[in-house]
Swiss-Prot record:
PANTHER family: DNA POLYMERASE III SUBUNIT ALPHA, ERROR-PRONE DNA POLYMERASE
Database matches in SUPFAM superfamilies: PHP domain-like, PsbU/PolX domain-like
Chief localisation class: cytoplasm
Organism annotation: Corynebacterium diphtheriae (strain ATCC 700971 / NCTC 13129 / Biotype gravis)
Name this protein carries in UniProt: Error-prone DNA polymerase
Keywords: Cytoplasm, DNA damage, DNA repair, DNA replication, DNA-directed DNA polymerase, Nucleotidyltransferase, Transferase
GO cellular component entries: cytoplasm
Subcellular location: Cytoplasm
Molecular function GO terms recorded: 3'-5' exonuclease activity; DNA-directed DNA polymerase activity
One of the GO biological process terms: DNA repair
Designated gene of the protein: dnaE2
Amino acid sequence: MVDWVSGVNGKPLKWSQLEGVLSGTYPQEFKLANVGGSGSGSEKIRYYSSQPFAELHAASYYHFLHGANSPQDMVAAACQQGMSALALIDRDGFYGAMEFAEAAATSGLPTVFGAELTLAPDRILTVLARGVEGYTSLSRLITQARMRGSKDVTIYPPLAEIVESMGKNCRFLLNHSWCTDESLLEIFYPDTVVLEYGVTMRPEDVDHHELLDSIRQRYGFMAIASAVPSAVDRVSARVAGAKQALAQRESLPQATPRLHPMGSTWMRGGDELAGSVDKQLLDASVEVARDCAFALDLVAPNLPRWPVPDEMAHLTGLVNARFDARYRGRSEDVKNQARAQIHHELAVIKELGFPGYFLIVDDIVSFCHTNNILCQGRGSAANSVVCFVLGITNVEPISTGLLFERFLSRDREGPPDIDIDIESGRRDAVITYVYDTYGRDNAAQVANVITYRTKAALRDAARALGYPNTSADAWSTNPDEAPNAVRFLAEQLKGQPRHLGIHAGGMVICDRPIADVVPTEWARKHGRSVVQWDKESCASAGLVKFDLLGLGMLEALHHMIDLVVETTGTTINLWEIDLAEPEIYTMLSNGDAVGVFQVESRAQLATLPRLRPREFFDLVVEVALVRPGPIQGGSVHPYIRRRNGLEAVTYEHPILERSLRKTLGVPLFQEQLMHIAVDAAGFSGGEADELRRAMGSRRSVDTMNRMKRRFFAGLRRNNITGDIAGILWNKIVAFVAYGFPESHSQSFASLVYFSAWFKYHHPAEFYVGLLRAQPMGFYSPQSLLADARRKELTILSHNINKSQVEATVENGAIRLGLNMIKGVGKTEAEAIVAHAPYRDIADLSRRAGLGVAVIEALARSGALETLGVGRRQALWQAGAAATEKAAMLPGLSMVSAPSLPGMNAFELIVADIAMTGVSSENPVALLRRQLELRGVIPASELLNCENARRILLAGVVTHRQRPQTAAGVTFLGLEDETGLANVVVSVGLWKRSRAVKVARAVLVRGVVHNADGVASVTADRVEELPFAEMMSAGSRDFR
């Protein structure tokens, strides 16, 4: 019998509908339609087999290192095989439950939820939840076991306690392994036990079934059949087998005696199983499913209520109290507009019922301010005057023309989304505060599902197939050399979940235990607990997420602010900085942006002179412009040409003008593409947001296909057809998936301006702030200090009598800190600073309590030269000095050093770079005379070269970068003593030149491309520069 069926309007089934499906009678409201699955968009048919059957012990790939397929694929297979219901069982968790629920709801397939509990390594208890109450009880039990143990250890209570705590809210699925000890069976309530006849097609099935038969006759337990599948078909079963071998740290050949002959079992419907087991066992599976199935439409916890009688009145009071301080120095016109806007925003917040959300965000931000932690709201919160007044954001929305409706409107579903960037060195303190304030049960971080990428997939595929680790590691970096079998298995693993990680900063906060909705467990990082879902599943369940993100530039800005106070006595408030200083924009237009947030990359430095920003919105554009979305959508060059008056502003269709007017007809921001969906295809705001989320999700193929059909239908209603329709869809796909939201661009643009402001007005403090916040940004300390020298700043070397632990500003110069010296830890550096100054090395050793290794590190770095000894002499004295103790007479163990020659310039640079990563000059400077004889020009001369001229260029490699949007082309960053240069390396040259891949300093022959104030070199030959290995500070390679 064949029929088609879908859910009602894609929504989860009601109980009456669900019961009808389980009993074989199909409600009238079901549509005859295509259903389910996650394939390529082809139509899927739902079959009903002649033998009813519900698979109640299947595993998706969220049973980590066990299952082979996604929940969507498992649901599709169940539908195609005519199953009455499906249970996807994870180990010690509900990792894939929400994805499973969403896929099944779309397909109209009833769902059963459960988990395997690891009571002991050889004792696994499978539990099926009966309805919402059973799900909640099981989630709490898993949480208790996870939190009682550690990241990799789960500690459940004794079996009797599990049975008691679950009561009648579950069914215990017991296979043959539970029947060998009848004392265990006595612990269960008889009416909660279901014996599981595994139909695995292995010879031992016969013996297992005979044992189950005997127990069934003796106790009268209910019994069902199950294929126990961990794959959708035989091909995928091999992948599941490989994963299961990896889980046991074995190869497939080693694990073969314990694995299924085909690797694993796979999905089989009732008709196929009917020849292997009693029909009653198949019928009983439907009965158990009817007893347990429910739609996972959980009632998510609310946000904690703020402890005040009236949350809205409290929020209004906070805004009124802080208004004057935040708007100090603004014009009366701006103040009046801000007051009116606040009245409007508070009305919307009240109407939508979100005052509690703003109070929680304000609480977190206030903690940061109270504890001198720099933070800033990111995203569309920058459009809100309320957020600005509360101190959540630092961009004043009235003067910058930002629209509140892009942040919050009456059409929006769910709470607003405020991401909080926090200086990276203090983010842990903020997260700890959230745990302490809201409770470990009610607050947790969001998970990040770690999936297989190419290298890891190749490595694990090789290990699974029995190859040694050395081969696995080699093939992970050179995939073409791997055997076909390894590459085939790796390709199947790619994109699949491997284990659970932790989101960069997402936290959920609830008014009751999160375990009512999803289990929590310990993260790898000490003191962190995470929910078992990623941000998409949390959003689907209605859990409210707060993003607390670490940002290195905020840490650097904090250092800059503190340094300005130290050097000038002036306190800088970021929100009071004038965003319209022409000098700042001139500096950026000249490409002078090394160290400036977000615009210091190779591509950004090449774009700035072309765009020539003149106002704040230009920086917003600059942040969004050099991104995969605009690049793939072909927007970068058209926008710049139009911005500079070299190309007319046009629109591909008149209906697009409203969405694209502000960016001259060229789509740049993610929101614009959503507006196109609204204007051109008639989407609602909610549909446009659903489209955005679907395109950004790895699991929304079906939703994307549905939205695509809806989009083209909407275009036809507006008479937009043919090529234009296809172009619009392609732009949306490129931008919504990879484009940068304007709301984020606004927030990041403020940090661009703030950091550029410090570079222009307080350059020494700027560079020292960056040094203190390392590692961060695009450039190494060596490149940052070279840029400082080009600004005619003086760099003072490490000095045990003058250096502090970190870099400092000393009379307008940059003094390097002791923490930059390799081999000198923070404790040793603090001891050196605390007891300074020193008379000699022995004095240093005694009073600072330093060992031989630390003194030798100081000697090699030149930090001891202030004592009147060269580096070689200091190394000679280090051993003897370190043997002196504080109680000994000074000089008792000193050995006179012989007369040793000082280091030459080359040796000093080598020693500096080896010990500190920075040198007093660029190594290439030592070769300049020889290079000039060969016709090699300095980087500073590139802008003076004629376009298309062939030149020679030499430099230290600062970066190797191969963006996904560059079709395999690699970009080298080179630096000599005069500046930076960008070198373009073709795919062919990269393949045939070893130097371009590994050399630390290179000599390049190539052709200059010089236009619009930007010069680059396209290389045709690359060779290693002499002595490069010893002279280079190393490169920062990006792939």
